[in-house]
Amino acid sequence: MPKRGKKGAVAEDGDELKTEPEAKKSKTAAKKNDKEAAGEGPALYEDPPDQKTSPSGKPATLKICSWNVDGLRAWIKKKGLDWVKEEAPDILCLQETKCSENKLPAELQELPGLSYQYWSAPXXKEGYSGVGLLSRQCPLKVSYGIGEEEHDQEGRVIVAEFDSFVLVTAYVPNAGRGLVRLEYRQRWDEAFRRFLKGLASRKPLVLCGDLNVAHEEIDLRNPKGNKKNAGFTPQERQGFGELLQAVPLADSFRHLYPNTPYAYTFWTYMMNARSKNVGWRLDYFLLSHSLLPALCDSKIRSKALGSDHCPITLYLAL
């Protein structure tokens, strides 16, 4: 079992436990950040009102939420389930659950309305990785992993097929502090891309989860200081771009909000990053292009607390 240690430590397999190295700042820049943290500057993000109709005017019929909870038990103690009950999604996808199925908290198993529950966790690594998918409707079919042994040992992917689409929730491997796992991440990216392309050839695809990459400079607060750090290396960004092109998929948030800055989903626990909005957009809803006419809205719930990530929500009119 990997030692928990401090945030920013490296697990035994090299997976990084959430860090966000910052570029060195001048005193002037530091003062600017203080003003922005106080709401006096442009750095804070306000989630606009939900758009619940498609471009053609059809009302939304499906609401999916995704959240990296950074440990189910801690998330529940921090009232994460209260937010879920208020948000009331039709499907809830969770990443970094750090919990085997036989140790799931009772509060989660008894969650009203989301009675079809599917979980995946590493067989030999207690308290590490893990994903969950909870649904109001019973899926036609559910599978786990991407069908390649090298990549299916850490409980990172669940696939659920519904009538009109396939939903994949994923917790993509982190390249690690010092990029100790970058080569593995590149192999994962290639295998994951092949897998998703196969799925998307049969049915429209929705991919959601913590994809552990900020795609463009607009997707993190300090791009210049992080080009050699996990989550923003050229290799990871290129891999993400190739995923969008090859499958193909569209980034639902950027499709609707192409130029909106300061929209992040992850903030390190260190250095008051969240209050200053020094963050990264690592969590996504990616859609087959055939689903774009059904896209009503793609939301970042940045005010929801309970993890070092915030939840994201997708509205579709299917």
Curated annotation (Swiss-Prot):
<protein>
    <recommendedName>
        <fullName>DNA repair nuclease/redox regulator APEX1</fullName>
        <ecNumber>3.1.11.2</ecNumber>
        <ecNumber>3.1.21.-</ecNumber>
    </recommendedName>
</protein>
<dbReference type="Pfam" id="PF03372">
    <property type="entry name" value="Exo_endo_phos"/>
</dbReference>
<dbReference type="GO" id="GO:0043488">
    <property type="term" value="P:regulation of mRNA stability"/>
</dbReference>
<dbReference type="InterPro" id="IPR005135">
    <property type="entry name" value="Endo/exonuclease/phosphatase"/>
</dbReference>
<dbReference type="GO" id="GO:0006281">
    <property type="term" value="P:DNA repair"/>
</dbReference>
<feature type="site" description="Important for catalytic activity">
    <location>
        <position position="283"/>
    </location>
</feature>
<keyword id="KW-0963">Cytoplasm</keyword>
<keyword id="KW-0479">Metal-binding</keyword>
<keyword id="KW-1015">Disulfide bond</keyword>
<feature type="region of interest" description="Necessary for interaction with NPM1 and for efficient rRNA binding">
    <location>
        <begin position="23"/>
        <end position="33"/>
    </location>
</feature>
<feature type="site" description="Transition state stabilizer">
    <location>
        <position position="212"/>
    </location>
</feature>
<dbReference type="GO" id="GO:0005739">
    <property type="term" value="C:mitochondrion"/>
</dbReference>
<feature type="modified residue" description="Phosphoserine">
    <location>
        <position position="54"/>
    </location>
</feature>
<dbReference type="InterPro" id="IPR020848">
    <property type="entry name" value="AP_endonuclease_F1_CS"/>
</dbReference>
<dbReference type="GO" id="GO:0005730">
    <property type="term" value="C:nucleolus"/>
</dbReference>
<keyword id="KW-0539">Nucleus</keyword>
<keyword id="KW-0702">S-nitrosylation</keyword>
<feature type="modified residue" description="N6-acetyllysine">
    <location>
        <position position="197"/>
    </location>
</feature>
<feature type="site" description="Cleavage; by granzyme A">
    <location>
        <begin position="31"/>
        <end position="32"/>
    </location>
</feature>
<feature type="region of interest" description="Necessary for interaction with YBX1, binding to RNA, association together with NPM1 to rRNA, endoribonuclease activity on abasic RNA and localization in the nucleoli">
    <location>
        <begin position="1"/>
        <end position="33"/>
    </location>
</feature>
<comment type="subunit">
    <text>Monomer. Homodimer; disulfide-linked. Component of the SET complex, composed of at least APEX1, SET, ANP32A, HMGB2, NME1 and TREX1. Associates with the dimer XRCC5/XRCC6 in a DNA-dependent manner. Interacts with SIRT1; the interaction is increased in the context of genotoxic stress. Interacts with HDAC1, HDAC2 and HDAC3; the interactions are not dependent on the APEX1 acetylation status. Interacts with XRCC1; the interaction is induced by SIRT1 and increased with the APEX1 acetylated form.</text>
</comment>
<feature type="region of interest" description="Disordered">
    <location>
        <begin position="1"/>
        <end position="60"/>
    </location>
</feature>
<keyword id="KW-0597">Phosphoprotein</keyword>
<feature type="compositionally biased region" description="Basic and acidic residues">
    <location>
        <begin position="16"/>
        <end position="38"/>
    </location>
</feature>
<dbReference type="GO" id="GO:0031490">
    <property type="term" value="F:chromatin DNA binding"/>
</dbReference>
<dbReference type="GO" id="GO:0046872">
    <property type="term" value="F:metal ion binding"/>
</dbReference>
<keyword id="KW-0496">Mitochondrion</keyword>
<dbReference type="GO" id="GO:0042981">
    <property type="term" value="P:regulation of apoptotic process"/>
</dbReference>
<dbReference type="GO" id="GO:0003906">
    <property type="term" value="F:DNA-(apurinic or apyrimidinic site) endonuclease activity"/>
</dbReference>
<feature type="short sequence motif" description="Nuclear export signal (NES)">
    <location>
        <begin position="64"/>
        <end position="80"/>
    </location>
</feature>
<keyword id="KW-0540">Nuclease</keyword>
<keyword id="KW-0805">Transcription regulation</keyword>
<feature type="binding site">
    <location>
        <position position="212"/>
    </location>
    <ligand>
        <name>Mg(2+) 2</name>
    </ligand>
</feature>
<feature type="modified residue" description="N6-acetyllysine">
    <location>
        <position position="31"/>
    </location>
</feature>
<keyword id="KW-0678">Repressor</keyword>
<keyword id="KW-0804">Transcription</keyword>
<keyword id="KW-0234">DNA repair</keyword>
<dbReference type="GO" id="GO:0016491">
    <property type="term" value="F:oxidoreductase activity"/>
</dbReference>
<dbReference type="GO" id="GO:0044029">
    <property type="term" value="P:positive regulation of gene expression via chromosomal CpG island demethylation"/>
</dbReference>
<feature type="binding site">
    <location>
        <position position="96"/>
    </location>
    <ligand>
        <name>Mg(2+) 1</name>
    </ligand>
</feature>
<keyword id="KW-0255">Endonuclease</keyword>
<keyword id="KW-0233">DNA recombination</keyword>
